[in-house]
From Swiss-Prot:
Residues 1-12 have a biased composition (Polar residues). This is Casparian strip membrane protein 1. It holds the Pfam family CASP_dom. GO terms for biological process: cell wall organization. It comes from the Eukaryota. Belongs to the Casparian strip membrane proteins (CASP) family. The keyword DNA damage does not apply. NCBIfam families: A_tha_TIGR01569 (TIGR01569). The keyword Cell membrane applies. It comes from Taraxacum kok-saghyz (Russian dandelion). Residues 1-24 are annotated as: Disordered.
Length: 207
């Protein structure tokens, strides 16, 4: 009959299906893709160490100045005296204590002057020269401050305990305030030594 059409369904065989190309191309092999990894900029941890370095230097200044003030202001006069003698103790009676004050003052001044160099290391963490300079100078200050603190500590020990073999009596029973002040100054100086040692370790890690 006219106007009518007949639809005929043709079933494909498996062989004919294999011969046809796939509609979607397979994804390319993973080996052909180049992965671009953007590396984080270096120097982040070095900048953090440099900031901590500045904080430690400020703490070292406080400890060194505390040692200088405590030792430099040490002065005690006993309330009794004789016709010819007045019993008085001052830090400059002993050259070791005088050296102690000078050495810790030098250390405090150095730490203050080294802060701008340490700030440069914060701004430019990759610079090696300033860090090497600070490491060298910190090591010198460790030696100076340790010598001053060790010498003063030996005198403080004798002041507290005396020495029976040398017939040196302990004086801290009479000059109690004097001994307390010089002992505090020695402790502050050793704290400065510890701070300087930490600064050397930080500088070594920052190189």
């Amino acid at each position: 009959m006219e106007g009518e059409s007949t639809a005929v369904n043709i079933t494909e065989t498996p062989k004919e299906r294999k011969g046809k190309a796939p509609l979607l191309a397979p994804p390319p092999a993973s080996g052909g893709i180049k992965t671009i990894v953007q590396k984080a900029p270096k120097g982040g941890y070095k900048r953090g160490l440099a900031v901590f370095d500045v904080v430690l230097r400020i703490a070292g200044i406080a400890a060194a100045l505390g040692a200088v003030i405590a030792m430099g202001s040490t002065d005690q006069t006993l309330p009794f005296f004789t016709q010819f003698f007045q019993f008085k103790a001052e830090f400059d009676d002993l050259p070791v204590f005088t050296f102690f004050v000078i050495a810790n003052a030098i250390t405090a001044a150095y730490l203050a002057l080294s802060i701008p160099i340490s700030i440069v290391c914060i701004i430019r963490p990759h610079l090696v020269g300033p860090r090497v300079l600070l490491t060298f100078l910190d090591t010198v200050m460790v030696g100076l401050t340790t010598a001053a603190a060790g010498g003063a500590a030996s005198i403080v020990y004798l002041a507290h305990n005396g020495n029976s073999d040398a017939n040196w009596p302990a004086i801290c029973q009479q000059f109690n305030d004097f001994c307390q002040e010089v002992s505090g100054a020695v402790v502050a100086s050793f704290i400065t030594v510890v701070v300087l040692m930490f600064l050397i370790v930080l500088s070594a890690f920052s190189l």
